[in-house]
Amino acid sequence: MCGIVGYIGKKEAAPILVEGLSKLEYRGYDSAGVAIIEDQVIRTRKCKGRLVNLEEKLNEESMIGDIGIGHTRWATHGEPSDKNSHPHNNEKGTISVVHNGIIENYIELREWLTSEGYKFVSETDTEVLPHLIDYYYKGDLLEAVMTAISKVEGSYAIGVVCSEEPDKVVAVRKDSPLIVGLGEEEYFIASDIPAVLNHTRDIYLLKDNEFVLMTKDGVKLFDKEGKEIKREIYHVTWNADAAEKGGYDHFMLKEIHEQPKVIKDTMTSRIMLGKDIKLDNIEISKEQMEKINKIYIVACGTAYHAGLVGKYTIEKLARIPVEVDIASEFRYKNPIIDKDTLMIVISQSGETADTLAALREAKKKGARVIAVTNVVGSSISREADDILYTWAGPEIAVASTKAYETQLVAMYILALYFAQEKGTLNKEELEELKEEMLSIPDKAEKCLETDEIMKKLASKTHMKKDMFFLGRGLDYAVALEGSLKLKEISYIHSEAYAAGELKHGPIALIEEGTIVITLATQEELFDKTVSNIKEVTTRGAKAIGIAFEGQKNMDKAVEEAIYIPKTKSIFAPLLSVIPLQLYSYYVSLEKGCDVDKPRNLAKSVTVE
């Protein structure tokens, strides 16, 4: 969740580091800092809070140097504070380290280093690293880092500089993302590609346990045995301005409005009328499909909600039993998996720590794994057997919108593909579903026209302390996502329930004026859902309903009805979520919250 940037070249390092860190703000952070080598001395500036605080500090106490490392920290060990911010230095101030991840054996290492005379000034796990590297340093920084890392247990992406070797940056990764940027006589390390895109499009994608040595002459990669590695350069084709706001007030609003396009992009070349579905990076034969007796879908947060839609859709169309698990729970329950199990992992970043751990657990037990991810070359995409990329483009706002939509599209593509390969749908049925799916981008565009309605609704309801979301079947999965969006960015306590469960407890929470938002797009369940709405309105709730155009009965059941274009009920989640995203956005705006960077949250959760 932290962001790392490192630089060596001919330019001033400080502004490049700060600019790079600003491109990683979406990852979430509570403090920031840089270390620059100036006249063979490491100068460190760091502080709690936003990057603007660090920039003010740098303006007051400028640093001149063409080599350095920078960091935005998300607290895991030790509170957010200046002393706990990175970079961390050894006592002599000759070695400086930035780190993303968790050192699991830091207590043992700290006790041992303390017994060796080292003094600690922070509460972080990271501070063991500069002391450990110092302990093993004998004039060769790369060798010292390699030896120190061999003593470390946990996950890490690390950048190191040393004033005694002022022409080097050393880095290493394990279970935490790190890339190398290859510029014109300048080189970079970073947690993610956007940090270097203003300077280069050529990068190395590092694998676990690989070390980097950057000098002004170039970059060398090594394995943990010290053997040099050759790596193909990956050329980034998307533009840096893809991560800009494009005239919208916030990234989140921009990304909501990009959804019709990214839905279409994710379907392109995969869903075509009159042609079989062919997926470039999935190589499951018909024979292998026949042997699959169970599917696990594993994900976290919003991606988990996409997985719930995937379960319903795959079971309905392909008739394969599907279980959906939260990744952080899955890996500890000793799941029943074998070679005839298929696992689908969903992660926008492709670096979600719990999802990656679940993937590895499944592979250990012999399962085949399909990754659904938005990031080419991410850890999850490299370790899975098959990949279905979601073409959402960079998503900057912490609260996911367009990435969620493309994850839903991926679930529908897989469901149709499995049905095609297993023969559970005939050609006419497949063509009918594909034709309807291809109409979704235009219908999603129409859903954006609810903007003004949701804005007015937000202005009337943003002061409420509690809200509830209801739905049945696929509507329940969307209710969960709508509730999560609201609590993520507006900090309003919100819960989602299967509408039929109301009478089993949740109805006790309904009182005069309670806001209840109900989705009613599943036609076979519409009447039952309306009955549930009546149960809450008779107890004083203010009901808001989302239904298809033409469902005029909704007007009579709720105080405010929002209508979306009609589609087949199975595809409703792609449309019904859009008004809920807009509502959450405008409630957050009314409350004066930080829409793109909500408190306590990070975009990419790369620690367990």
Curated annotation (Swiss-Prot):
GO molecular-function term, one example from the UniProt record: carbohydrate derivative binding
Active site residues per record: 2, 603
Top EC class, one word: transferase
Entry keyword Transferase: yes
Species this chain originates from: Clostridium tetani (strain Massachusetts / E88)
Subcellular location: Cytoplasm
This protein's encoding gene: glmS
Glutamine amidotransferase type-2 domain span: 2-217
Keywords of the record: Aminotransferase, Cytoplasm, Glutamine amidotransferase, Repeat, Transferase
Reaction it catalyzes: D-fructose 6-phosphate + L-glutamine = D-glucosamine 6-phosphate + L-glutamate
Protein name: Glutamine--fructose-6-phosphate aminotransferase [isomerizing]
InterPro entries: GATase_2_dom, GFAT, GFAT_N, GlmS/AgaS_SIS, GlmS/FrlB_SIS, Ntn_hydrolases_N, SIS_dom, SIS_dom_sf
GO terms (BP aspect): carbohydrate metabolic process; fructose 6-phosphate metabolic process; protein N-linked glycosylation; UDP-N-acetylglucosamine metabolic process
Keyword presence, DNA-binding: no
Subunit note: Homodimer.
Annotated function: Catalyzes the first step in hexosamine metabolism, converting fructose-6P into glucosamine-6P using glutamine as a nitrogen source.
Gene Ontology, cellular component aspect: cytosol
Main subcellular location of this protein, as a coarse class: cytoplasm
Protein EC: 2.6.1.16
Segments forming domain SIS: 284-424, 453-598
